[in-house]
């Protein structure tokens, strides 16, 4: 499976082993944290989803793994620990605003040991070019994702060509209330990634097609970045 391949590549690329300190921002149910802790790394996983963190904690307890899970919005996460490697996977970086990205990268810089690394993935401009502006209306839009009860859902997708940003605006209409969710996604070129990282004290070491170390392709819908603290 991709996660196994990816974790194996990380182990060899970053020399992950006993005593290595790793932080996984947006760790979810611990898919990476669990695998890296099995290599005797000391892992911290941060995620906003209580259900995911509970599942991850149960897995760690069952396998007696050294993982510290934190149920928190990672934008608010603080620690005195210093890490050799920081992960942010599943293109989470793209969902942050420019100010949030700057905050995150500055924190990553502070949280890392000297010459520590960041590995993250982002959506490419190819993926941006594939996105279309559209309007969609559906009863129980996204198969009931937004509410356990009945509702009507509207999705409006807007593209911002200059900024390379896409907005998915969801309007959910229930019997008792109506609310709106704004999902912003930033799409990147390698040059834009490099600009943001170098402004926060990082040097880009390599680009890959994904977080399993597949060679970089300019045709891909996403790409991965390894950056080193300067």
Q: What is the predicted role of each segment?
A:
Residues 190-230:
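C-terminal lobe and adjacent flexible extensions of AdoMet/dcAdoMet transferase-like proteins
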């Amino acid at each position: 499976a991709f996660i196994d391949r990816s974790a194996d590549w990380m182990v060899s690329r970053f020399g992950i082993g006993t005593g290595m300190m790793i932080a996984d921002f947006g760790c979810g149910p611990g898919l990476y944290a669990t695998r890296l802790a099995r290599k005797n790394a000391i892992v911290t996983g941060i995620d906003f989803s209580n259900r995911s963190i509970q599942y991850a904690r149960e897995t760690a307890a069952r396998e007696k793994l050294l993982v510290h899970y934190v149920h928190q919005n990672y934008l608010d996460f603080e620690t005195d620990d210093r890490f050799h490697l920081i992960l942010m996977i599943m293109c989470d970086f793209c969902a942050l605003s420019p100010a949030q990205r700057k905050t995150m990268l500055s924190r990553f810089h502070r949280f890392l040991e000297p010459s520590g690394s960041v590995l993250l993935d982002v959506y490419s401009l190819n993926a941006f070019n594939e996105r279309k502006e559209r309007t969609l209306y559906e009863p129980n839009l996204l198969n009931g994702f937004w509410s356990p009860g009945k509702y009507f859902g509207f999705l409006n997708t807007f593209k911002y060509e200059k900024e390379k940003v896409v907005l998915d605006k969801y309007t959910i209409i229930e019997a008792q209330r109506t609310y709106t969710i704004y999902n912003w996604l930033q799409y990147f070129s390698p040059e834009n990634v490099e600009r943001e990282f170098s402004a926060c004290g990082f040097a880009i070491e390599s680009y890959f097609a994904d977080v399993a170390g597949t060679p970089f392709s300019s045709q891909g819908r996403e790409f991965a970045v390894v950056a080193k603290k300067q």
